[in-house]
Design a protein with these regions (language model features):
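Aromatic-lined glycan-binding groove of carbohydrate-active enzymes
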Residues: 8, 184, 190-323
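Conserved small/polar residues in nucleotide/adenosyl-binding loops
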Residues: 324-329
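Acidic-and-aromatic substrate-binding clefts and catalytic sites of carbohydrate-active enzymes
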Residues: 15, 56-63, 84-96, 180-183, ...
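Substrate-binding cleft and catalytic face of glycoside hydrolase catalytic domains
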Residues: 105-136
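Aromatic-lined substrate-binding rim segments of carbohydrate-active enzymes
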Residues: 68-73, 80-81, 87-113
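Conserved, mostly hydrophobic/aromatic
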Residues: 9, 72, 169, 308
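An active-site-proximal structural segment forming one wall of the substrate-binding cleft
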Residues: 140-166
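N-terminal regions that are enriched for targeting/export leaders
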Residues: 2-61
Length: 330
């Protein structure tokens, strides 16, 4: 018998201004700034995408957060996974919307946390990021044991909240870049111990992973192997098992890289990226949504401890020229 899928939507809190973004991008900058300036790049390209139900909303408003929940419930979504940005030594960004959700008790809708553990730089939000030198806005750091404790205690109220999503009684916690944490085993031990000291059953840690990943220490031989479908299929097993061996309870799988390679050809895929990186060329990289979906998943995504990702649409052209065309809910 098949169980009903638990659909959780990632929640980006970028839709409200903060001083750091004001400093680097101008007063009032949010994710809407680039969305509103987007233009069609070819005939039939649907841009700009003007938000319908809620307009260009501001996440500081509780009314907006309530309406988001109504839309989510209508779509059959169980809860939100709020991205939070903990850079180490107590430094956070974009924390206000989630803090208000926890402190106010509203909306009454399930949630969990995802740690977006990556450095912020000027390359993140600019569609023309190849045209200027990258500047670090906030660096991701991992100070060690005391910071793990501070991180946990900062979110303890959320962890104790009855709305927090659990798996087998454990707190679901997603990590964006799981292999970037220098000693995840230590973090896991500390957090589970602190959880139990506070009457909680511990954590269910999920690491995000592409089922096909290009690494910095790639050899020419392994590049050639990636040119075959079979090698791409085998890649997922080793990627997922690597995270399990490092102590993660589950994997949130993503297949964008793999799907793009197979929808193009490996040679064309790498050539486009080479030209963009080396010669700063702004190439429109587009794929048919159906081709992406047909190549997005692997058999390992059916494992009990692997949680696949659903992408109903993808158009990153406000930031960079990458998009999927002709998406359909069918």
């Amino acid at each position: 018998m098949y169980k009903k899928a638990r659909v959780i939507a990632f929640y980006l809190p970028q839709y409200h201004p903060i001083p750091e973004n004001d400093m680097f991008w101008g007063k009032g900058f949010t994710e809407w700034t680039n969305v509103g300036k987007a233009k069609p790049l070819f005939k039939g390209h649907y841009q700009p995408k003007v938000p319908a139900d809620l307009g260009y909303y501001d996440l500081r408003l509780p009314e907006v957060r309530e309406e988001q929940v109504n839309l989510a419930k209508y779509a059959g979504i169980e809860g939100f996974c709020y991205w939070h940005y903990w850079f180490g030594s107590g430094k956070e960004l974009l924390e206000r919307p989630f803090n208000e959700v926890v402190n106010s008790g509203h909306p009454n809708f399930p949630f969990c946390l995802g740690w977006a553990n990556h450095t912020w730089s000027t390359k993140t939000w600019s569609a023309s990021n190849s045209q200027f030198k990258e500047t670090v806005i906030m660096e991701q750091t991992y100070p060690g044991e005391e910071d793990y404790k501070l991180h946990f205690n900062t979110y303890l109220k959320a962890f104790k909240d009855s709305r927090y999503i659990r798996v087998d009684g454990k707190l679901l916690f997603v990590i964006f870049s799981p292999l970037s944490i220098p000693n995840f085993v230590e973090m896991k031990r500390i957090w589970n111990n602190l959880a139990m000291e506070n009457g909680l059953k511990g954590f269910y840690f999920i690491g995000i992973a592409e089922n096909y990943t290009v690494t910095n220490n790639t050899t020419s031989h392994s590049i050639k192997k990636r040119y075959t479908y079979s090698s791409l299929a085998k890649k997922a097993e080793s990627v997922y098992n690597n995270l399990f061996e490092k102590g993660f309870d589950a994997v949130n799988s993503r297949g964008s890289n793999r799907a793009q390679v197979l929808s193009d050809s490996p040679l064309v895929y790498y050539f486009k990226r080479f030209m963009m990186k080396v010669f700063n060329l702004k190439i429109i990289v587009k794929y048919n949504y159906k081709d992406i979906i047909n190549n997005y998943y692997v058999k390992e995504d059916k494992w009990d401890n692997v949680y696949p990702t659903i992408i109903p649409n993808f158009d990153r052209s406000p930031r960079a020229c990458l998009l999927y065309t002709s998406p359909s809910p069918r």
